[in-house]
Amino acid sequence: MSQSGKNGLTYSDAGVDIDAGNLMVEKIKPHVRSTRRPGADGEIGGFGGLFDLKAAGFSDPVLVAANDGVGTKLKIAIDAGKHDTVGIDLVAMCVNDLVVQGAEPLFFLDYFATGKLDPDQGAAIVAGIAAGCREAGCALIGGETAEMPGMYSGGDYDLAGFAVGAAERGQLLPAGNIAEGDVILGLSSSGVHSNGYSLVRKIVSLSGLAWDAPAPFGDGTVADLLMTPTRIYVKPLLKAIRETGAIKALAHITGGGFPENIPRVLPKPLAAEIDLDAIKPPAVFSWLAKTGGVAANEMLRTFNCGVGMIAVVSAGEAEKVAAVLAREGETVFTLGRMVSRSEDAPGTIYKGNLAI
């Protein structure tokens, strides 16, 4: 074992490089500054991040918090050496969970843990986090970088994100007026997003394809297409919420797919009737289903299958809400409707067939 000078071991001898950490902080400062917004204009490096809620323009706010990770999508990033977009995924997974409650994301903090800190790799990850924050309109006000030799092997790392938002009191979602006959709008996903990647990786392994091989489900390599960042729906949804006042509920379609996520925002006497014929799944989902022999029901409870977010609106307001979302860049379609259900019936029922 090496020793540094006559005073014995150093922290660096144990595998923790403080200088590398300081270098990474300098590299990420411009990215952090790029996320400033009303309420947050400080520098990183303090013991805690600051946010001025009054400067954000709220009069009687309720704070909403969420935290999440990116799951084993990170293994593809590590194996493929592509680290510049997982930060966007990290932000998306948190802020999309805020906006479904009607909250505007205000600030974000990240946790980055690795066995051996590479300042350039870390800076690329944080650059992605900053890009996600800018897209969501929230400030990156702090974070933690933990170099933990012995806890993670090789170039492995993990990420966790923490987001806080606010909504005016009385404007939180879901609203209490969801009714039979209400329309369910679907918002298209950008791809697999950040759920189901243990199954994705298993299927890719069975296929024999390398990460840098041309993808059979689109233009680009397998890794590039599977690393497509999770879509951030925040700004279009906030615009629709504020302009129309007609959105009754939103559900972020993440782990558990339709059957686990949609019922979370519905009153117990109602179920979501989903028209599977209305969904146009991206080619990646057909490839996953066919290559892995994954049944349609398993696809629907594992992946978003092309629908990353749903909105519940009254039938008379559906066209107006869809128009605002489309104007803001979303692909929107009628996915289903609200129907009555008995106490022991599932909260999601299907008609038609998923085109995979």
Curated annotation (Swiss-Prot):
GO cellular component, one term: cytosol
Keyword ATP-binding: yes
Keyword Nucleotide-binding: yes
Highest taxon above the source species: Bacteria
SUPFAM superfamilies with a match to the protein in the record: PurM C-terminal domain-like, PurM N-terminal domain-like
Gene3D superfamilies: PurM-like C-terminal domain, PurM-like, N-terminal domain
Pathway: Purine metabolism; IMP biosynthesis via de novo pathway; 5-amino-1-(5-phospho-D-ribosyl)imidazole from N(2)-formyl-N(1)-(5-phospho-D-ribosyl)glycinamide: step 2/2
Location relative to the cell: Cytoplasm
Enzyme Commission number(s) of this protein: 6.3.3.1
HAMAP family linked to this entry: AIRS
Protein name: Phosphoribosylformylglycinamidine cyclo-ligase
Record organism: Sinorhizobium medicae (strain WSM419)
Lineage: Bacteria, Pseudomonadati, Pseudomonadota, Alphaproteobacteria, Hyphomicrobiales
